[in-house]
């Protein structure tokens, strides 16, 4: 009967599972060695430093150390959230993080799809190579380019004045309203080509017969993209979106620090700059640590919520 058949099949499965032998361990010794190295690296550089989080709950004094500094509970967190500057920094970080996420995410997908539509292999490789190059430029170089382009005598002002869009040049870095779009543009220009790599890989894994079937049904390029390409890369899009949601508070440090000035600091400062200012420059390590813990906890919560949302809607999940 059915129960007897299931019992026999389970017994067969158990019989086919061979225990890990010393011979198997020796055969995989290189893999096991590097796995052990990475585990040790993770423990030393990712888990042991978490002991420093105790500073956020202390009136930390470097001369006393973590073990002997006075325990103050959540006092540093209360000070943090009563600081108007920190609340403004949270607003800036969230705003720039969301804008950067949407802008870089969408442009990378669109760029990968458009690149896939180029039929000339030589042309496609040339465009790919050119689009990857900005990723390898440091933010110091990128901000230098932006300063030259957006200065009063820069090419952007010259073009806008010559086209009579502006009556006179403007100082983009003196108006807070321009700062967030400038940061978003810089991130898109720098990372679009690099971020498109994984989408191009996902597109190449789509079965070519699906495109052939769509062509037989009379589908043009747009319909092939809509009904074949986008559904084919949807799992990749969802997974990367879930991973990037947790990085919303990683809105950046270098570009904001290098482009920011006293005129726009109310819109340019992020949590990382706040931590640098209070935690390192002014030596208040407890406040800096508390701000870092807040940032980490919010990132974890965002990832969990995004993952649960994807699970509820039947999409791909991280865990």
Task: Identify the residue ranges that each predicted region occupies.
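A structural signal for multi-pass alpha-helical bundles of membrane permease subunits
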Residues: 24-319
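Short, Lys/Arg-rich, polar N-terminal cytosolic tail immediately upstream
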Residues: 1-24
